[in-house]
C-alpha cells in the first residue's frame, strides 16, 4: 500500500512538472498527451517494481484469474496478424476503447515494441468512467503472436498472449490467453468486463476483416 501511495504521488508530481507548451488536451481526457506519457512512465516503473516485489497471493489481498478465448477468421494468417496486432484497428470495435496514445514505437531483435496508453470509458454502476490503461505490446512477427502487459488504477494488471494459428484454406484461429490480477474485491468485475470486451473486439475485427473493411 505504501508503494502505491508513493506511486500516485509521483504520478501527480510528474504531471505538474510537464512543460506548459505540451500538446493540447483531447476531449476525452483533461491531460495532454505529454502528461499521459509521464503517467505511463510512472505507471511502468511502479509496475516493474510491483511485479518483482509481490505476487497475487491470498495474504496480499489480490487474486489472479486466467481465461482463454478464441475466434476463427476466414482470412490468411499473415493478413489477420497484421490487422489484429495493430491496436489502432481496435478503436471503434471495442465498447470501452476511445483512442490509443502511442508513446514509443521501435524494433529490437526482430521484436516490435509499442509503449501505449488506452483511453477507455468503462461503465461502473451504469456510469461511464474515463480510465487510462498503460501498457507495452511486444509483437513477434516470426512467431505470429504478440504479448501485452498493462496496468490500470487501482492496481489492475493484465497479461495477454495472442496467438495466430493457420488452419489452412485461408482461415486463421486467433487465441487470446488472458491473465487478470486485481484485488479480491475487484477480480470478478475485472474478469467479467475484461473477457466481454475482448470477445466484442474479436467479433468486430472478424467482421471487419472478412468484409474487406480491414
Describe the residue ranges of each PLM region.
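Hydrophobic pocket/interface hotspot
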Residues: 79-84, 90, 146, 174-176, ...
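Glycine-rich portal/gate segments that line the openings of hydrophobic small-molecule binding cavities
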Residues: 58-60, 72, 92, 102-154, ...
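Hydrophobic ligand-binding cavity/cleft-lining segments
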Residues: 27-108
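Positively charged n-region of N-terminal signal peptides that target proteins for export
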Residues: 1-6
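Bacterial N-terminal signal peptides
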Residues: 9-20
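Sec/Tat signal peptide C-region and signal peptidase I cleavage site
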Residues: 21-27
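Beta-strand/loop substructures that line and gate deep hydrophobic ligand-binding cavities in soluble
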Residues: 149-200
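Envelope-exposed proteins and targeting segments
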Residues: 65-69, 133, 142, 160, ...
Amino acid at each position: 500500500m505504501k508503494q502505491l501511495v508513493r506511486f500516485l504521488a509521483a504520478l501527480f508530481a510528474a504531471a505538474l512538472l510537464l512543460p506548459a507548451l505540451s500538446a493540447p488536451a483531447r476531449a476525452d481526457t483533461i491531460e495532454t498527451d505529454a502528461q499521459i506519457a509521464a503517467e505511463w512512465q510512472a505507471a511502468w516503473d511502479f509496475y516493474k517494481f510491483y511485479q518483482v516485489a509481490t505476487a497475487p497471493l491470498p495474504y496480499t489481498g489480490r487474486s489472479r484469474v486466467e481465461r482463454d478465448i478464441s475466434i476463427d477468421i476466414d482470412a490468411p494468417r499473415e493478413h489477420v496478424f497484421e490487422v489484429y496486432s495493430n491496436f489502432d484497428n481496435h478503436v471503434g470495435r471495442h465498447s470501452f476503447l476511445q483512442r490509443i496514445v502511442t508513446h514509443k514505437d521501435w524494433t529490437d531483435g526482430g521484436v516490435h515494441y509499442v509503449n501505449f496508453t488506452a483511453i477507455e470509458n468503462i461503465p461502473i454502476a451504469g456510469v461511464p468512467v474515463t480510465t487510462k490503461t498503460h501498457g507495452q505490446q511486444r509483437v513477434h512477427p516470426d512467431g505470429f503472436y504478440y504479448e501485452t502487459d498493462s496496468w490500470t488504477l487501482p492496481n489492475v494488471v493484465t497479461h495477454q498472449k495472442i496467438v495466430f494459428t493457420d488452419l489452412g484454406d485461408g482461415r486463421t484461429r486467433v487465441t487470446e490467453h488472458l491473465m487478470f490480477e486485481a484485488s479480491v474485491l475487484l477480480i470478478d468485475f475485472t474478469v467479467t468486463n475484461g473477457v466481454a470486451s475482448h470477445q466484442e473486439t474479436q467479433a468486430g475485427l472478424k467482421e471487419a476483416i472478412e468484409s474487406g473493411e480491414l
